[in-house]
């Protein structure tokens, strides 16, 4: 199982966007520069976040992006699904119906009405992961980071985003 780096980029950027002390919209270039990531790739990530309704774009000289909802209502699952889509992780091809010893013209109920047990287990596992990710929000992440980040670093981060001329 693997999520693209876009999920990581999105979560880090959205984390900075939860800081109410930054009094402006966030530009992609600033976010990419601050984190040392590709502006081009981050633009693609932000397009997905906007399309999913997590972000809105603010036009103009001081434009950029803002969250559309409060951090407590944006879950990790919302972000993952915005970047990766909502297709199930496991794709069952029902290969059990291709067994060489089966009469494909007369498959029993075991093969046609009973779900594949492997698929059932995989979908149950995915559902548990989704429930966990749904429980974790940007507000939770902000609180965790605030508890662990040195206060001086937090102030410097806010200053960096608020004062582009000081860079």
Regions found by a protein language model. Give the residues of each.
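Key DNA-contact positions within bacterial/archaeal DNA-binding proteins
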Residues: 40
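Alpha-helical residues within the helix-turn-helix
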Residues: 33, 50-51
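Beta-hairpin "wing" of winged helix-turn-helix
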Residues: 53-62, 66-68
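Short, hydrophobic-biased segments on the C-terminal half of alpha helices
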Residues: 46-47
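Short alpha-helical segments that sit at the start of domains
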Residues: 1-14
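Conserved segment of winged-helix/HTH DNA-binding domains
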Residues: 71-98
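A short alpha-helical element within helix-turn-helix/winged-helix DNA-binding domains
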Residues: 28-36
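C-terminal regulatory/oligomerization modules of transcriptional regulators
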Residues: 92-167
